[in-house]
């Protein structure tokens, strides 16, 4: 099995502006890898190139230059996308269908029939917590419920890779938490998740690695614990320690009955890293 789920090499996308001599560079010389089985967050402000990058990976937009691969296959090939699920930022739903009918419709598009399809529908409705709402029309669903049925729709073909473009956009905190738990569950099942998000605290909770885009450029990329670590600072967590002991740190701790619970790198937050990264990039 290929250990790299998604590979992006030298990716550039330029959009011409009609009736103008200018053009918009949406993505600039982008290189990144998404490991199989990990949750990778592509972060950035509006217009940074996140959605364009995802659409190129999915074969929905052609790159100006560069290439993308899904599990070692060129993503332009239809076969490379047979085991890929996608939830766009603003998915379109047939509001007159019920939740069950929606999954049945997309399941048939993916070639499922009979009892395997019915079993898959039941599994997914249970996974996203919509079993009790399966016979309701989508027109009666809340935004959070629509996102969950959209995620179930993206999973109908039992994908190895799921691409989520702003999966919690417009969802209230409770619904956002449910989506977060579903993404964690996908990771537990060994499914690779590539997502874009503007909810940095949530991304910090669920992503193994992140890449931060600004003006189409990857300005930060790596594992979260490394990115948010503050160099030359260490936190000591002590039990039963007096304020004096805290000030004197380890030497006095060893001479006392205080117990050193943990020692770790001090960290910033993903939100602070994001703001610093995007503020400093002037391209």
What are these regions (language model features)?
Residues 224-283:
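Short, charged/small-residue-rich alpha-helical element at the C-terminal edge
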């Amino acid at each position: 099995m290929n250990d790299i789920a998604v590979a992006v090499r030298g990716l550039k996308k330029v959009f011409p502006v009609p009736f103008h001599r200018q053009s918009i560079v949406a993505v600039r010389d982008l290189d990144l890898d998404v490991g199989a089985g990990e949750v990778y967050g592509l972060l950035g402000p509006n217009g940074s190139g996140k959605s364009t990058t995802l659409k190129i990976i999915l074969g929905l937009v052609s790159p100006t230059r560069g290439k993308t691969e899904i599990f070692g296959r060129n993503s332009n090939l239809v076969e490379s996308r047979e085991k890929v699920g996608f939830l766009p930022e603003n998915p379109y739903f047939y509001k007159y269908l019920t939740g069950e009918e929606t999954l049945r419709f997309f399941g048939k598009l993916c070639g499922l029939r009979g009892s395997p399809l019915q079993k898959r529908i039941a599994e997914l409705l249970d996974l996203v917590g919509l079993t009790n709402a399966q016979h309701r029309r989508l027109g009666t669903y809340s935004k959070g419920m629509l996102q969950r049925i959209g995620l179930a729709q993206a999973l109908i073909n039992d994908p190895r890779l799921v691409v989520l473009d702003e999966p919690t956009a417009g969802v209230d905190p409770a619904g956002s938490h449910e989506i977060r738990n579903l993404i964690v569950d996908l990771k537990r099942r060994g499914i690779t998740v590539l997502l874009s998000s503007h909810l940095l605290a949530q991304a910090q909770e669920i992503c193994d690695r992140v890449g931060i885009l600004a003006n189409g450029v990857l300005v930060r990329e790596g594992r979260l614990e490394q990115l948010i670590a503050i160099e030359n600072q260490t936190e000591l967590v002590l039990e039963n320690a007096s304020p004096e002991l805290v000030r004197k740190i380890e030497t006095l701790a060893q001479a006392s009955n205080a117990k050193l619970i943990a020692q770790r790198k001090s960290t910033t937050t993903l939100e602070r890293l994001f703001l610093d990264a995007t503020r400093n990039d002037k391209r």
